[in-house]
A protein has these predicted regions:
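Secretory targeting and sorting signals
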Residues: 1-10
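Short substrate-entry loop that stabilizes the transition state in hydrolases
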Residues: 97-156, 256-257, 284-285
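Domain-level recognition of soluble alpha/beta enzyme cores
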Residues: 11-116, 334-341, 352, 361
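Alpha/beta-hydrolase active-site loop
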Residues: 150-219
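The feature captures the conserved acid-bearing segment of alpha/beta-hydrolase catalytic domains
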Residues: 110, 245-313
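Active-site machinery of serine-nucleophile hydrolases
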Residues: 59-62, 71-86, 127-168, 308
Length: 382
């Protein structure tokens, strides 16, 4: 989070957080993979090879399994410290170890499922899109969330090591290296999913995987969604990697410098596969030159959706978590807007599912054709 809000009254106990339950017909299983790219040096810590942690959620049979926490204790602590500094509250009020609706290592439901990759926003954790990910899984997708190591606040590996953020000061060149690194991360994750689908175990420690997980991956149907820099990552990856069939950008600029018109390849070249743009607040193609140029050069299905009463972090779990804090809603508005959190979350879930249903499952979705009375907060800019 980048905005700052006034001081809130101290609370002696953490606030009880929870995510809205997914509404699809499937229960949600979850597992983690530790992936090591021995062929690539880490761009932020050159003495190390590139290591990634990814979370795989999948339709599951949950008998005898237990729900998992939103974040591991080490990651939760670092994230709470950072967020509390922004919110000007005691970190003890932020308990990011609350239980999700995802069940650890549950057996996968038989059947091959389309796969959706998730890339988080800049300097954010892969955990912060859990509500959208759980919904997609409940609708029958496998969702793979990627932490971009040394950019996320903290990444915890199975042996207990915690990799903290290690980015140099912001600049155009650092931004280009950051997106290029994310694109390489995404391609490597796709390579490892291919190993998994062939019956192998790509986990660096060869930890036991959930029963039936590899057989559930249909890598002939792959989508990608990302928030902020993650949305830029989705587009840039699609330029160079044709394995991704459809992408969605949640409120992310696709420029390294708007003023210098230094845009990504996805903007300058466009795409020949479907792409969804979702924005909030004052951000849209009307205000973002990179989006306008992208839409001019795009050569396939595209749609822009807008939540005028939302803000940048509307497209993360902060939308439903922050309103539970004892903070004036007006003070939270620069982060998550004034849109009703439940309506906003329901709308995002519905439109994102419809997008992937139409373009990965080839099921026409009238919801994408124009405004809906069911989701009055969403606009269709001309």
């Amino acid at each position: 989070m980048a905005a700052s809000v006034p001081t809130a009254a101290a609370s002696p106990l953490p606030v009880r957080f929870e995510l809205p339950a997914p509404t699809g017909p499937y229960s949600v299983g979850i597992t983690e993979l530790h992936l090591v790219d021995q062929a690539r040096q880490d761009p932020w810590v050159p003495t190390a090879v590139r290591e990634l942690m990814v979370t795989i959620r999948y339709p599951a049979t949950v008998n005898g399994t237990s729900p998992t926490p939103f974040m591991s204790p080490a990651v939760a602590e670092v994230t709470a410290d950072e967020d509390a500094a922004t919110l000007k509250i005691d970190p003890a009020e932020l308990d990011y170890g609350f239980t999700t609706h995802s069940n650890l290592n549950a057996h996968a439901v038989p059947g091959r499922r389309p796969v959706v990759l998730y890339s988080p926003g800049g300097s954010r954790s892969r955990s912060m899109g859990a509500s959208l990910m759980e919904q997609l899984v409940s609708e029958g997708y496998v969702v793979v969330a990627i932490d971009h190591t040394h950019e996320a606040p903290a990444v915890e590996f199975p042996d207990g090591r915690v990799a903290r953020r290690a980015l140099p000061p912001s600049s155009i060149e650092v931004g280009k290296r950051l997106i290029a690194t994310r694109v390489q991360d995404t391609g490597f994750v796709l390579d490892q999913l291919e190993v998994l689908a062939r019956g192998g175990n790509p986990d660096a420690g060869r930890r036991r995987l959930p029963h039936g997980l590899g057989r559930s991956l249909d890598l002939g149907r792959i989508g990608m969604v990302g928030h902020s820099a993650g949305g830029f990552t989705a587009g840039e990856t699609m330029v160079s990697d044709r394995r991704i069939d459809a992408g969605a950008n949640l409120d992310g600029s696709m420029a390294y410098s708007q003023s210098a018109r230094d845009f990504g390849r996805v903007v300058n070249e466009g795409l020949d596969r479907p792409f969804l743009l979702m924005s909030a607040g004052n951000h849209s193609a009307a205000s973002d030159p990179s989006w306008r140029e992208f839409l001019t050069n795009h050569r396939a299905w595209a749609r822009q959706l807008h939540l005028p009463e939302g803000e940048h972090f509307t497209f993360t779990d902060y939308q439903v978590l922050l309103p539970r804090l004892d903070i004036d809603p007006a003070a939270l508005a620069p982060l998550i807007g004034t849109v009703d959190p439940a309506r906003s979350t329901a709308a995002q879930r519905a439109y994102l599912t419809a997008f992937f249903d139409q373009h990965l499952r080839h099921r026409p979705q009238p919801l994408l054709d124009g405004p809906s009375d069911r989701y009055p907060d969403v606009r269709f800019p001309s």
